């Protein structure tokens, strides 16, 4: 990150997360065990808040600045704009000179320990009101957040060998930041280019396969095993989403005993498909069961047709009975007749009232249903041009209408230098990542996380009998997906309404 970008002044968003004004004070609400991120208004006397991490009866605070980064207003004209997006830890400053070179305070992190008690804590003009409810550790959240990780983007950016010791060291702060937001699925690749080459960096297989001269197959799970263990150590999981048995274009590859790369088009239902995947599924199942990972593993697919999914699902159950299937799709689950999709993710732009009626029956069967956005819709989303409250909406909205969580296709598929320009190709800037290379969160990720926390609170309050279905129905009616897609919602009012609900 250059000093130029650090010192450029851009417009600061003066919204507040989980906070409210009270005279010349600003008040935040938090549950016991919660970490709150709130914006500091421009007119707040932030000089009164200590820069270094300060503790008061089980509550600590830390201040962050927001450093601006460039993005293309129009990918064709390349006119650049600035947005304050990168969280910068101000407690790491060494002296006054360092401080002058840092952005001003913009975000306050409030950490309430699990041993804290109900009451009010004061930090200068900031008051933190602790509510007598407990938010469990992030590993115990039930909300299913799935943000696809990209190891090869880290390898390229830091110029380290994929899956070397140096690579894992570079990945760790990014993966831990994602885990802090509640990411529950580790993105694993079973082949090269599961989605073609749509990012700056290509995905490759984590399982090397060799076809022997006698026609048998050999599989090397070394990288797969190391990566799963690494991801879980960082806090991501326990689920393992394996992409995919149905790549875009159907092309798969392997090596022969001479090390030559061979390719074939393996369309579901064909002999080529069965030859390529049959022995693998049997051996992969054996390996997963030996590791104790089978129950948490999904064969995952992305926007595949019902015809393809039907053939793949039947083949999976033939070769690996009990293997789960995950699917990000733009159709209702009922269109996949006779197919058990254990984790179905619905595109927001194709959401319907009829689809919402399927959520409760799926949950009763033990199946997950989540919501996703990608390069569309234009609103709400998590682009650089998106309002911060859009990210909060995407995190919290699933909880008020019966979804189990949220998915986005790119957590860290960075462009060449995301600290200079977040634009890549024809994608809208910010579409390809939410966390920066050194593990810094974007403000878009922070707002999404706060929405996830609100959703988790809604779940806990419902289970405790503190919320009834009617209240959520009213919220869904007032802040529903149709008005959101039509840009008719005041997202700030939605955020305020949700925070009033969960912190009452």
What do these predicted ranges mean?
Residues 251-254, 265-269, 273, 277-331, ...:
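Catalytic domains of carbohydrate-active enzymes that cleave complex glycans
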Residues 343-427:
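Catalytic-core region of carbohydrate-active enzymes that cleave or remodel glycosidic bonds
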Residues 22, 43-99:
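Surface-exposed binding patches on compact interaction domains or structured appendages
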Residues 104, 169-170, 222-223, 307-308, ...:
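Short, glycine/acidic-rich beta->alpha junctions
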Residues 50, 92, 97-101, 108-118, ...:
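Aromatic-lined carbohydrate-binding surfaces of glycoside hydrolases
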Residues 20-42:
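Beta-sheet-dominated interaction scaffolds and their linkers
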Residues 33-39, 102-111:
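Short, solvent-exposed loop/turn segments enriched in Ser/Thr/Gly
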Residues 3-15:
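Sec-dependent N-terminal signal peptides
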């Amino acid at each position: 990150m250059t000093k130029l970008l650090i010192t450029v002044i851009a417009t600061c968003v003066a919204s507040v997360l989980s906070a409210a004004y009270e005279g010349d004070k600003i008040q935040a609400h938090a549950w016991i065990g919660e970490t709150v991120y709130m914006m500091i208004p421009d007119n707040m006397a932030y000089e009164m808040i200590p820069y270094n991490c300060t503790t008061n009866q089980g509550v600590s605070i830390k201040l962050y600045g927001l450093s601006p980064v460039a993005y293309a207003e129009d990918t064709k004209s390349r006119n650049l704009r600035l947005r304050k997006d990168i969280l910068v830890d101000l407690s790491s400053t060494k002296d006054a000179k360092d401080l002058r070179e840092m952005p001003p305070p913009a975000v306050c992190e409030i950490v309430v320990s699990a041993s804290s008690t109900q009451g009010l804590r004061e930090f200068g003009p900031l008051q933190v009101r602790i509510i007598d409810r407990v938010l469990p550790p992030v590993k115990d959240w039930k909300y299913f957040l799935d943000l696809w990780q990209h190891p090869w983007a880290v390898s390229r950016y830091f110029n380290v060998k994929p899956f070397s010791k140096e690579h894992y060291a570079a990945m760790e702060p990014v993966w831990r930041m994602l885990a802090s937001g509640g990411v529950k699925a580790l993105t694993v690749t079973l082949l090269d280019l599961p989605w073609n080459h749509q990012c700056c960096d290509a995905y490759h297989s984590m399982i090397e396969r060799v076809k022997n001269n006698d026609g048998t197959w050999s599989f090397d799970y070394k990288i797969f095993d190391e990566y799963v263990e690494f991801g879980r150590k960082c806090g991501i999981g326990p689920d393992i989403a394996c992409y995919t048995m149905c790549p875009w274009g159907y092309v798969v590859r392997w090596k022969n005993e001479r090390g030559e790369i061979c390719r074939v088009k393996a369309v579901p239902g064909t002999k080529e498909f069965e030859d390529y995947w049959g022995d693998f599924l049997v051996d992969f199942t054996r390996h997963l069961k030996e590791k104790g990972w089978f129950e948490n593993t999904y064969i995952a697919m992305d926007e595949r047709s019902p015809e393809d999914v039907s053939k793949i699902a039947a083949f999976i159950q033939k070769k690996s009975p009990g293997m789960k299937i995950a699917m990000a799709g733009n159709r209702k689950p009922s269109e996949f007749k006779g197919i058990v999709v254990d984790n179905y993710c619905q595109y927001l732009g194709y959401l319907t009232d009829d689809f919402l009626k399927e959520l409760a029956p799926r949950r009763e069967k033990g199946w997950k249903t989540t919501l996703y956005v990608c390069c569309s819709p234009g609103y709400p989303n998590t682009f650089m041009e998106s309002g911060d409250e859009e990210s909060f909406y995407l995190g919290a909205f699933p909880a008020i209408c019966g979804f189990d969580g949220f998915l986005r296709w790119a957590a860290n598929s960075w462009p060449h230098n995301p600290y200079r320009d977040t634009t890549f190709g024809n994608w809208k800037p910010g579409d390809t990542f939410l966390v920066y290379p050194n593990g810094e969160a974007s403000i878009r990720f922070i707002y999404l996380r706060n929405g996830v926390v609100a959703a988790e609170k809604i779940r806990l309050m419902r289970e405790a009998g503190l919320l009834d279905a009617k209240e959520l129905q009213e919220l869904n009616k007032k802040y529903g997906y149709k008005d959101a897609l039509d840009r008719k919602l005041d997202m700030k009012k939605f955020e305020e309404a949700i925070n009033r609900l969960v912190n009452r």
